């Protein structure tokens, strides 16, 4: 087997490694606003496989899940209903936030592209987390753990990302 030389990172590459995970808050806001503004888009977007965990921002995850839940229960998704669900949430001012979401909603013609971007960015975050887990496991490798175990765990994680998104 041919011996390969180790990869040596310079300080800039190490600093780049500490950057923020990929996300697009504007896309998340535009999608949520579009779903509130036009409830007919909800089924179309949920059929794409978009789930709450695909959103980067935690309260966007909550909002999306409530929208899907309300829609599945046959309820109209409106600012008024959402506001009442989130009025005890101290994280944001639900009144102005929901109005802002609707005001900045994506056009229904590009909504699928916006949803796909949110999904793709989520996949990238999951891949980065898997790579970081692999890196940590590789550095923490002990004599009682085989390299093949780490490879197998990583393969399983990648397969799950591929299957579940």
Q: PLM ranges: what are they?
A:
Residues 1-123:
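Noncatalytic partner-interaction/assembly domains of nucleic-acid and motor enzyme complexes
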Residues 19-20, 73-77, 142-145, 160-165:
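Short, exposed beta-strand "edge-strand" segments with a Pro/Gly-rich flavor and a Y/T-containing core
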Residues 95-163:
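Extended, charged alpha-helical coiled-coil/arm scaffolds that mediate oligomerization and mechanical coupling
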């Amino acid at each position: 087997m041919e011996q390969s030389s180790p990869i040596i990172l310079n300080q800039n590459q190490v600093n780049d490694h500490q950057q923020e995970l990929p996300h697009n808050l504007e896309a998340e806001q535009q999608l949520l606003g579009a779903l509130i503004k036009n409830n007919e888009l909800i089924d179309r977007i949920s059929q794409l496989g978009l789930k709450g965990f695909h959103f980067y921002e935690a309260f966007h995850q909550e909002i999306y899940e409530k929208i899907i839940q309300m829609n599945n229960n046959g309820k109209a998704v409106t600012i008024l209903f959402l506001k009442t669900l989130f009025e005890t949430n101290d994280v944001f001012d639900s009144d102005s936030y929901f109005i802002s979401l609707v005001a900045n909603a994506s056009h229904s013609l590009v909504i699928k592209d916006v949803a796909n971007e949110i999904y793709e960015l989520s996949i990238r975050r999951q891949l980065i987390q898997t790579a970081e887990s692999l890196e940590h496991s590789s550095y923490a490798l002990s004599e009682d753990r085989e390299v093949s175990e780490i490879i197998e765990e990583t393969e399983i994680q990648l397969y799950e990302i591929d299957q579940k998104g």
